[in-house]
């Protein structure tokens, strides 16, 4: 798992690559939370275009960042999920949540 972050105005864009599993989520989670806290971030955009696999720990990481952004009055978007990741998002119910609240 590899990731990159970039701030564009008040948005933090996080590009994830590879597999999201229990071995990598704590590092990603902690770094994203740190960047949200120290920068003036009001939107979090998570680019899933290069994610090949995601397990339940990835779902937990996404939901935790969503709750963090909502508690700050911000918003979060998931963009470009690959078909297999999109299916995980759909089965977990997260896809519906993001379509409804983050369009």
PLM regions and their residue ranges:
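Amphipathic alpha-helical interaction surfaces in cytosolic regulatory modules
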Residues: 22-97
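Short acidic-hydrophobic, aromatic-tinged amphipathic segments that line or gate anion-handling sites
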Residues: 98-103
């Amino acid at each position: 798992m590899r990731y990159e972050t970039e701030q564009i105005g008040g948005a933090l864009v996080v590009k994830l690559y590879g597999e999201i599993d229990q071995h990598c989520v704590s590092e990603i989670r902690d770094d994203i939370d740190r960047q949200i806290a120290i920068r003036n971030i009001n939107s979090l955009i998570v680019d899933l275009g290069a994610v090949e696999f995601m397990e339940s720990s990835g779902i937990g990481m996404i939901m935790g960042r969503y709750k963090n952004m909502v508690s700050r009055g911000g918003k979060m978007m998931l963009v470009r999920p690959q078909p297999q990741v999109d299916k995980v998002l759909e089965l977990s119910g997260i896809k519906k949540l993001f379509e409804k609240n983050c369009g």
